[in-house]
Amino acid sequence: MAIDAQKLVVVIVIVVVPLLFKFIIGPKTKPVLDPKRNDFQSFPLVEKTILTHNTSMYKFGLPHADDVLGLPIGQHIVIKANINGKDITRSYTPTSLDGDTKGNFELLVKSYPTGNVSKMIGELKIGDSIQIKGPRGNYHYERNCRSHLGMIAGGTGIAPMYQIMKAIAMDPHDTTKVSLVFGNVHEEDILLKKELEALVAMKPSQFKIVYYLDSPDREDWTGGVGYITKDVIKEHLPAATMDNVQILICGPPAMVASVRRSTVDLGFRRSKPLSKMEDQVFVF
């Protein structure tokens, strides 16, 4: 009988206790997105914050409060909209990270009057849903994968840069340096400026940001003026000859084409039409 009692105790410890513990804490949350899935999932808009006359931050809810989106740092999602009976898709990079956001994800979207998906998102009301799938993309940032990142962003192209910078800022073991040149038309167009400055304050020895405006609205503007040219890149970003550096580019097509040419003129290896993680110049 004593032996049977001992066996019963062992069974309780090995089998019953873990099951009870699992029941109490609930199942481990899994990422909502699955790269192996090719179907779209729906997520409701739960909050909208207007940033400028045509740009807002949209927060979409996940199924459960402890869910994470499941998006590797630097990758994007695909959003589908049905426009006049035709399915249209566009790619967007969330500004939120799995490491600091649960139960929702955030998108920075500039809505254009003649746009398709961006216009649809701009017209969403609280409770309306979007359809997304992912993650997608060839860039996946990992701690200290580069010694120095040079970033060139225009408009909402700041989204992937902000995401990567936030990941570096939150990681006490990440020593990657970041130099960002952020171009916009007017000062009011500078998106996430307070958030970016907060990241610089977290790691001032690693982060440097220079703002460029096409048309400054005040005479005492202390940032750069004009387009992001070869000379601007040479002055503010790491040189091609430096060890383990990479240039990241995201923004309007005309700006991207121009700065890509400039990087080649400055000695960087010519970027491929479809960028790869190992490229010296990567275009999102």
Curated annotation (Swiss-Prot):
One of its GO terms (biological process) is tRNA wobble uridine modification. Induction: Protein levels are highest during exponential growth phase and lowest in stationary phase. GO terms for cellular component: mitochondrial outer membrane; mitochondrion; nucleus; plasma membrane. It is a single-pass membrane protein. It is found in: Mitochondrion outer membrane. FAD binds at residues 122-137, 148-180. It catalyses: 2 Fe(III)-[cytochrome b5] + NADH = 2 Fe(II)-[cytochrome b5] + NAD(+) + H(+); 2 Fe(3+)-[Dph3] + NADH = 2 Fe(2+)-[Dph3] + NAD(+) + H(+). It is an enzyme of class 1 (oxidoreductase). The chain crosses the membrane at residues 7-27. Pathway: Protein modification; peptidyl-diphthamide biosynthesis. Keywords: FAD, Flavoprotein, Membrane, Mitochondrion, Mitochondrion outer membrane, NAD, Oxidoreductase, Transferase, Transmembrane, Transmembrane helix. Optimum pH is 5.6. Active from pH 5 to 7.5. Disruption phenotype: Simultaneous disruption of MCR1 results in resistance to diphtheria toxin and zymocin. Its cofactor is FAD. Residues 38-142 form the FAD-binding FR-type domain. It holds the Pfam family NAD_binding_1. Its EC number is 1.6.2.2. NADH-dependent reductase for KTI11/DPH3 and cytochrome b5. Required for the first step of diphthamide biosynthesis, a post-translational modification of histidine which occurs in elongation factor 2. DPH1 and DPH2 transfer a 3-amino-3-carboxypropyl (ACP) group from S-adenosyl-L-methionine (SAM) to a histidine residue, the reaction is assisted by a reduction system comprising KTI11/DPH3 and a NADH-dependent reductase, predominantly CBR1. Present with 4820 molecules/cell in log phase SD medium. Monomer. Component of the 2-(3-amino-3-carboxypropyl)histidine synthase complex composed of DPH1, DPH2, KTI11/DPH3 and a NADH-dependent reductase, predominantly CBR1. Interacts with KTI11/DPH3. Interacts with STE20. This is NADH-cytochrome b5 reductase 1. The gene is CBR1.
